[in-house]
Amino acid sequence: MVDPVAALCNYNVLEVIFSYLELDDLSHCSQVCKSWNLFLNDENSDVWRWHCLNKLPKEALKSDLLSSVSTYKTKLRAYFHAWSPNDCSRNVYIKPNGFTLHRNPVAQSTDAARGKIGFRHGRHAWEVIWEGPLGTVAVIGISTKEAVLQCHGYVALLGSDDQSWGWNLVENHLLHNGDMQGSYPLLNNAPKYQVGERIRIILDCDDNTLSFEKNYEFLGVAFRGLPDKKLYPTVSAVYGNTEVSMVYLGTPMDG
């Protein structure tokens, strides 16, 4: 029979030790034995709380931006999957909250940004919120690392080449390889995007498809036959001072 005092002591010791480890080390620790795996599977434990509070900007934790990721571990994961400050147009910067990009008011320029982490396998979802005016063109979707992130003029940059796939929220058109691939969603008089609405990008690398949800309503498959390449969440914008936030949700829930 396990001594409850000893068990509590062991729990507290693990809690202290794991709080000082790096996240990569925690991943390795979860594979050491069943008890450690169970311990780290508690996504709201004090260990994940400590790492979350110490690594995430306070501005993000105080806002409702992370309301779709309910545990400390998933909030932490979302932070490491947010916009990349090193993979965006020179006219874009990432705000101190770590999740929101800001496009500077530069004339005659279209500017894009990619997420830090892309995927080649599995199913993944990101929540995107356009928090400023759309302007004449506002595109969300995915791209490879080869897709261009800045160009002259006001154009639908995402979807302008064979390395990117996008949905233009202004005109409700799908774009790839410089061509309009049809209207989306396939509804009569489909409502246009309203600033602040939550859109989910759903990438299925196993089925090679890209889909979207708006306000938790599935809009259907947008693209099929995606290549066997690492794909990243991406947006392109033209409006000065517009802002776009993105939160990685993990594996999308069916239904």
Swiss-Prot record:
Any Pfam family the entry gives: F-box-like
Subcellular location: Synapse
Primary localization class, coarse: other
Residue ranges constituting the B30.2/SPRY domain according to the UniProt record: 61-253
Domain F-box: start-end pairs: 3-51
One GO CC term, this protein: nucleus
Superkingdom per UniProt: Eukaryota
UniProt-listed InterPro entries: B30.2/SPRY (IPR001870), B30.2/SPRY_sf (IPR043136), ConA-like_dom_sf (IPR013320), F-box-like_dom_sf (IPR036047), F-box_dom (IPR001810), FBXO45-Fsn/SPSB_families (IPR050672), SPRY_dom (IPR003877), SPRY_FBXO45 (IPR035784)
CDD domains: SPRY_Fbox
General function of this protein: Required in the presynaptic motoneuron to down-regulate the levels of wnd and restrain synaptic terminal growth at the neuromuscular junction (NMJ).
Family per similarity comment: Belongs to the FBXO45/Fsn family.
Subunit composition and interactions: Component of an E3 ubiquitin ligase complex composed of hiw and Fsn.
Protein name: F-box/SPRY domain-containing protein 1
Natural source organism: Drosophila ananassae
